[in-house]
Amino acid sequence: MSRTVFCTFLNREAEGLDFQSYPGDLGKRIYDHISKEAWGQWMAKQTMLINEKKLNMMNPDDRSLLAREMEKFLFEGHDVHIEGYTPPNQ
């Protein structure tokens, strides 16, 4: 049986993550308060960020940038801005 969380990103009850997929306190916070659906949306944005900004996950500065963007996206309601990208609906 899947677990349910109140997703702070979607602002409603939704299916929770199966396991803590990010380390540390931030990972615990994500596991407790972010749904699978919201995490999937972040994963898509993360992929775009890594590709468009040519981030190197071996570089601590790039990992820090990604962690900051993730926290802003999931918990503060900020969308990820990728220069030159126009969503398909617009």
UniProtKB/Swiss-Prot annotation:
SUPFAM superfamilies tied to this protein: YggX-like (SSF111148)
Keyword terms of this UniProt record: Iron
Protein name: Probable Fe(2+)-trafficking protein
Stated family: Belongs to the Fe(2+)-trafficking protein family.
Keyword set includes DNA damage: no
Biological function: Could be a mediator in iron transactions between iron acquisition and iron-requiring processes, such as synthesis and/or repair of Fe-S clusters in biosynthetic enzymes.
Domain of life: Bacteria
Gene Ontology molecular functions: iron ion binding
Family matches, as Gene3D superfamilies: Fe(II) trafficking protein YggX
One biological process term in Gene Ontology: cellular response to oxidative stress
InterPro entries attached to this UniProt entry: Fe_traffick_prot_YggX (IPR007457), Fe_traffick_prot_YggX_sf (IPR036766)
Quaternary organization: Monomer.
GO-annotated cellular components: cytosol
Pfam families: Iron_traffic
